[in-house]
Regions:
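Aromatic-anchored, glycine/proline-accented short structural segments
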Residues: 34, 38-90
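Alpha-helical scaffolding segments of alpha/beta enzyme cores, especially the outer helices
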Residues: 5-12, 39-46, 50, 75, ...
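Gly/Pro-rich active-site loop or hairpin
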Residues: 65-130, 138, 144-147
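Short, glycine/acidic-enriched loop or turn micro-motifs at the edges of active sites
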Residues: 25, 61, 139
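Hydrophobic faces of well-ordered beta-strands that scaffold small-molecule active sites
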Residues: 19-22, 55-57, 86-90, 131-136
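Active-site acidic/histidine proton-transfer and metal-coordination neighborhood
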Residues: 1-54, 64, 151-152
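Secondary-structure boundary elements
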Residues: 8-18, 49-56, 82, 124-127, ...
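C-terminal helical cap(s) of enzyme catalytic domains, especially alpha/beta-barrels
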Residues: 144-169
Length: 169
């Protein structure tokens, strides 16, 4: 109830702006970690449906939550309200030396397969086609001190673009 109340307050305060709700990552190792119940697909579904009706599906956040919860990534994603997708965020994951999952890295084969699975559901009409798909790479999450690699972006962007065109056919 508190989550819905807060979102409705924001929607009233910013009534001229569209509100899109993003599924968050589960990062139990962070001091500001989102409580696990807020990441359960059933609650995400309820909150999105009773407020904005628009989901920003962060595929990597969903994959990370599923890994930490010990459930299959596809099962976790399938339980989210795919018919309410408005936007998609895509990034790669990496297992840190501390054994914790991180996002905004280069896409691994496993990440590409999950993206393809999501896009296939959209292509078949099971989920709504997003208005926007964003490749999130680099930035402050690269905790190993290295800057974002331009070659990685140059390699991943065209491949992702082709997948988006395939999804839209």
């Amino acid at each position: 109830e508190a989550i819905v109340r807060d979102i409705r307050h924001l929607m009233a305060r910013f009534a001229d702006l569209p509100i899109v709700l993003e599924n968050l990552p589960y990062t139990p190792h962070q001091p500001y970690a989102v409580p696990r119940p807020a990441l359960e697909p059933a609650l995400i579904d309820e909150v999105v449906r009773t407020t904005s009706g628009k989901l920003l599906l962060d595929i990597t956040h969903a994959a990370m939550a599923a890994k930490y919860f010990g459930v299959d990534e596809r099962d976790y994603l399938a339980a989210l309200p795919g018919e309410l997708i408005h936007e998609i965020h895509i990034s790669g994951t990496q297992l840190g030396e501390d054994g914790l999952w991180m996002d905004h890295y280069a896409l691994r084969d496993e990440d590409w397969r999950l993206i393809e699975w999501v896009f296939d559901r959209i292509r078949r009409g099971e989920w709504r086609r997003p208005r926007v798909a964003t490749l999130e790479y680099g930035g402050m999450n690269l905790t190993d001190g290295r800057p974002s690699d331009r070659a990685t972006i140059a390699q991943e962007a065209p491949r992702l673009g082709e997948m988006i065109r395939w999804m839209s056919r």
